UniProtKB/Swiss-Prot annotation:
Belongs to the universal ribosomal protein uL10 family. Part of the ribosomal stalk of the 50S ribosomal subunit. The N-terminus interacts with L11 and the large rRNA to form the base of the stalk. The C-terminus forms an elongated spine to which L12 dimers bind in a sequential fashion forming a multimeric L10(L12)X complex. Forms part of the ribosomal stalk, playing a central role in the interaction of the ribosome with GTP-bound translation factors. GO terms for molecular function: large ribosomal subunit rRNA binding. GO terms for biological process: translation. Keywords: Ribonucleoprotein, Ribosomal protein, RNA-binding, rRNA-binding. This is Large ribosomal subunit protein uL10. PANTHER family: 39S RIBOSOMAL PROTEIN L10, MITOCHONDRIAL. The keyword Membrane does not apply. HAMAP family: Ribosomal_uL10. Coiled coil: none annotated.
Length: 175
């Protein structure tokens, strides 16, 4: 028994909602993966706030229809696809996918869409090499803190230098 029209509409609505919350979509060919391996991929993605969704290409096509951010995804909608929808930690999720692919040697990345732009496999690998958002924020905070510390030391040094000069001048014997 096939899916009812109402059921298909619910799936399309769910996919649209997931896409609205996502920053990036990675399309994987999942042919040959077992249920256990798909569960493994899903659990790896949970820590990075990514979702692996297996759905028919026709339903994904309906979900992206008219959405300029996701329209280019249509060129990847052939064959057996699993869609990894990434909400926040894009680099971490791509690392999780690559780690999974390295371990299973079964799944292939067809492509990805990030901020309305199709990415090649080499660009996807570059994203994986980026540090996480938290690491970048820590680096920026450290750099800003260093600048603030130097400014505070410089500001404090002017009155201290003036005080030392006045003290030296007052202790100098009058000639």
């Amino acid at each position: 028994m096939g899916r009812t029209l109402e059921n298909k509409q619910q799936i399309v609505t769910e996919i649209k909602s997931l896409l609205n919350d996502s920053e990036m979509a990675v399309v994987l060919d999942y042919k040959g993966l077992t249920i256990k391996e798909m569960s493994d991929l899903r659990s790896r993605l949970q820590t990075t706030n990514g979702i692996c969704k297996v759905t028919k290409n026709s339903l994904m096509r309906k979900a992206i229809d008219g959405d300029s951010n996701w329209n280019d995804l249509e060129s990847l909608l052939t064959g057996t696809n699993a869609f990894v929808l990434i909400k926040e930690d894009v680099g971490g999720a791509v690392k999780a996918i690559q780690s999974f692919q390295k371990d299973t040697k079964k799944s292939e990345t067809k492509g990805a869409l990030f901020e309305g732009r199709l990415l090649s496999n080499s660009e996807i690998k570059e994203i994986a090499s980026l540090p996480s958002k938290e690491v970048l924020m820590a680096k920026i905070a450290g750099a800003l803190n260093g600048v603030a510390t130097k400014i505070a030391i410089s500001i404090n040094e002017v009155p201290s230098g003036l005080a030392r000069s006045l003290k030296q001048h007052s202790e100098k014997p009058e000639s």
